[in-house]
């Protein structure tokens, strides 16, 4: 029987923008926990998926159907912090946007973990910039990720260099799910074995699927 925890046991808030992202997140969990009884006086309209993964207790929530953007995400995050007061940091995990270039060979299926680089904080908000004749010009920036998350990125890189990365195992676990198999997703051309590795570029950590015969 799954453990029944308290609100203060959850230290990570995990926000998904789309139901398919929530479903993928739930497939990767180590243990799912029973729902907690919330006090109606809290006025928390989020619906949480509570679980543990990698030794951390997480509260996962998806944005309301049809509500995508900065304002709904901010409202959801605010409610998480009000309900789970021991949350140390929040993660927005899902589909992101990127522009491939000669320096950043981003492709469909890549997993990208951004990190600070020079004056670049690590994440660019799409409406904090403008297009000029010479290219994209940033007009603002977000805060850098928490130190503990940057330390985790460094650990992932070190594990990759030592051949101890478990990223491929995690991806294989997800692909074994009928809902996320290659055939179900229309990726029938990807018949070769695929592994995941970390490739470091300025300001980014890429984890691209690579094919091996």
Regions found by a protein language model. Name each.
Residues 1-213:
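Intrinsic-disorder/coil detector with helix-boundary
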């Amino acid at each position: 029987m799954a453990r029944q925890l308290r609100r203060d046991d959850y230290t990570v808030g995990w926000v998904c923008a789309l139901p398919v992202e929530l479903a993928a997140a739930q497939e990767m969990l180590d243990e799912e926990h029973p729902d907690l009884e919330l006090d109606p006086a809290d006025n928390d309209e989020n619906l949480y998926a509570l679980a543990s993964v990698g030794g951390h207790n997480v509260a996962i929530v998806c944005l309301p159907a049809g509500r995508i953007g900065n304002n709904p995400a901010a409202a959801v995050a605010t409610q998480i912090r009000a309900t789970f007061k021991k949350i140390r940091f929040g993660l927005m995990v899902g589909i992101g946007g990127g522009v491939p270039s000669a320096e950043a060979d981003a492709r469909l299926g890549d997993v990208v973990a951004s990190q600070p680089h020079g004056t670049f904080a690590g994440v660019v908000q799409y409406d904090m910039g403008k297009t000029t004749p010479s290219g994209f010009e940033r007009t603002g920036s977000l805060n850098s990720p928490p130190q503990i998350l940057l330390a985790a990125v460094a650990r992932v890189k070190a594990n990759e260099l030592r051949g101890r990365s478990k990223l491929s195992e995690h991806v294989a676990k997800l692909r074994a799910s009928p809902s996320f198999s290659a055939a179900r997703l229309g990726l029938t051309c990807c018949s070769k074995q695929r592994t995941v590795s970390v490739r470091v570029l300025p300001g980014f950590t890429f984890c691209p699927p690579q094919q091996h015969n």
